[in-house]
Structures are given as structure tokens and as C-alpha cells.
A protein has these predicted regions:
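Conserved catalytic motifs of ABC-family nucleotide-binding domains
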Residues: 53
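Catalytic Walker B motif of ABC-type/P-loop ATPase nucleotide-binding domains
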Residues: 57-61
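ABC ATPase C-loop
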Residues: 49-50
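Conserved ABC ATPase signature
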Residues: 32-36
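Hydrophobic anchor residue at the start of the ABC signature
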Residues: 46
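Helical segment within the ABC ATPase nucleotide-binding domain
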Residues: 72-86
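Short, glycine/charged-rich "phosphate-handling" switch motifs in NTP-dependent
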Residues: 105, 117
């Protein structure tokens, strides 16, 4: 007879897998979230979403308020999720360089409208992108 696994147990097992994968969280597992650094909290937020096993992640401003070392850590994790775990990631990011380095396809918006679209690498080289970010 088939017995459906309890969702709480399944979520717990998934959380354990995520903790095993990210040493920074594993080492702080028994501490409250309020004592985590900004980067560790951002990783915890991403990890909480991963427990649900989504095929698509919507990520809003992952670098906002973080020190540069944590910005790099967050983008390394997103890159790993995209490449190793084949997750589709839709990202909104005001840090143009980081966002476009990460993007397969990027969109530069001005007043809510698409001003320029293209491959992330191409947009990084496009001088119009810099002008738009500087308000030109």
C-alpha cells in the first residue's frame, strides 16, 4: 500500500539537504536568523524558497544592502542554482554590472518601459546602458 509522505517531514529533509550544501548556514543552524549577517540572511531567504523545489525562482534585488563579499556569495549561489540545478531565475537588480554579468538575457528599463534588451554580455559592452543608468 502507498503511504503519502508527510509534508512536514519532506520539508525537513529538503531543508537538511540545503544545509548540507551551504556550509555558512550549516555552521549557524542553531542560531536565530536575527544574528545572521546580511549575506547569510539572504542565503537563508533563498534556501527557504528552495525547500518548495521550484523550477523558477523570482529574485528581487539580491545585492541590496550587502557588503561586496556577500554580493559575490549570493551571485555564486544563484549561478550554481542556474547551472547545476537547472533553475530558471528571473532577477531584478539595480547593480547593473552584477545583474548583466549573471543574465543570459537582460532588459534595461526606464520609467517602467524596456529601453534596451539583449544578451547580458552584449549589454555590458553597450555604452547606452551606462548612459541610461546615469540618467542620460
Amino acid at each position: 500500500m502507498y503511504k503519502r509522505q508527510d509534508k512536514t517531514e519532506e520539508s525537513y529533509q529538503e531543508a537538511e539537504k540545503i544545509l548540507d550544501k551551504y556550509e555558512r548556514l550549516r555552521n549557524r543552524r542553531n542560531q536565530p536568523a536575527k544574528v545572521l549577517s546580511g549575506g547569510e540572511r539572504r542565503l537563508l531567504e533563498i534556501s527557504r524558497a528552495l525547500v518548495m523545489k521550484p523550477s523558477v525562482l523570482l529574485v528581487d534585488e539580491p545585492s541590496i544592502g550587502l557588503e561586496p563579499r556577500y554580493i559575490s556569495m549570493v551571485f555564486e549561489i544563484l549561478d550554481d542554482l542556474q547551472k547545476a540545478e537547472k533553475k530558471t531565475i528571473i532577477l531584478v537588480e539595480q547593480n547593473a554590472k552584477k545583474g548583466l554579468e549573471f543574465a543570459d538575457i537582460g532588459y534595461v528599463l526606464v520609467s517602467g518601459q524596456t529601453a534596451i534588451a539583449g544578451k547580458g554580455d552584449d549589454l555590458l559592452k553597450n555604452p547606452d546602458v551606462g548612459r541610461l543608468f546615469l540618467g542620460g
